[in-house]
Amino acid sequence: MDGVTVIGHPLVQHKLTIMRKKETSTAGFRRLLKEISTLLCYEVTRDLELTTERIETPLVETDAPVLEGKKLVFASILRAGNGLLEGMLELVPSARVAHIGVYRDHETLQAVEYFFKAPDNINERLVIVVDPMLATGNSAIAAIEKLKERGARNIRFLCLLAAPEGIRNFQGAHPDVPIFTASIDSHLNEKGYIVPGLGDAGDRMYGTK
């Protein structure tokens, strides 16, 4: 599917299967989410640009590769997106973090923002938006609209699971934003849950219903 990268690494798929199981505990789910987010982050940052820096090892001076440009921004869609941050920040501790509380009004189809906090110079940074689920796509669409309004131009979206319906909606609104996911599942049910899915990621992560 154009514009969508499915991360099929065996460790990602194995951990995702355990997360799907209804008997997986809250603690287990949370631990697996941290582990899988680190693996997903590795893939979504695979093509970051490098430059060289003159360094001194214990033996000699040498030119060595380092990341080029301003620090990354990880943008979490509240609340479930926060579950992906811990593992990603362990991998990229210098990254900046944005938090976005936003939803789409189902009657007006307008984005309703209740919280937004982002680093400065977001227009000069790669922004990786994270949310475990791309179901209808409404929250992700609205969040990215808000980021673009504030100047973000280089954006990627990372999730655990995506539904075909959500992908279509998302790409219709933001065809310039690539999607990275561990799985494209079958469909949405009548309640808007991804099938086969893993349930409500936020509830399973925090032990709520």
Curated annotation (Swiss-Prot):
Q: What is this protein called?
A: Uracil phosphoribosyltransferase
How are cofactors bound according to the entry's free-text note?
A: Binds 1 Mg(2+) ion per subunit. The magnesium is bound as Mg-PRPP.
Q: Which HAMAP family does its entry note? A: Upp_B (MF_01218_B)
Q: Can you tell me which family this protein belongs to?
A: Belongs to the UPRTase family.
What keywords is this UniProt entry annotated with? Allosteric enzyme, Glycosyltransferase, GTP-binding, Magnesium, Nucleotide-binding, Transferase
* Positions bound to uracil: 194, 199-201
Q: Which reaction does it catalyse?
A: UMP + diphosphate = 5-phospho-alpha-D-ribose 1-diphosphate + uracil
* Binding positions for 5-phospho-alpha-D-ribose 1-diphosphate per the UniProt entry: 79, 104, 131-139, 200
Please list the GO biological process terms of this entry. UMP salvage; uracil salvage
Q: Which InterPro entries match?
A: PRibTrfase_dom, PRTase-like, Upp_B, UPRTase/APRTase, Ura_phspho_trans
Report the pathway entry. Pyrimidine metabolism; UMP biosynthesis via salvage pathway; UMP from uracil: step 1/1
> By what means is the activity of this protein regulated?
Allosterically activated by GTP.
Question: What enzyme class is recorded for this protein?
Answer: transferase
Q: Which PANTHER family match?
A: ADENINE PHOSPHORIBOSYLTRANSFERASE (PTHR32315), URACIL PHOSPHORIBOSYLTRANSFERASE, CHLOROPLASTIC (PTHR32315:SF4)
- Work out whether the entry's keyword set contains Transferase: yes
Q: What is its EC number?
A: 2.4.2.9
Q: GO MF annotations for this entry?
A: GTP binding; magnesium ion binding; uracil phosphoribosyltransferase activity
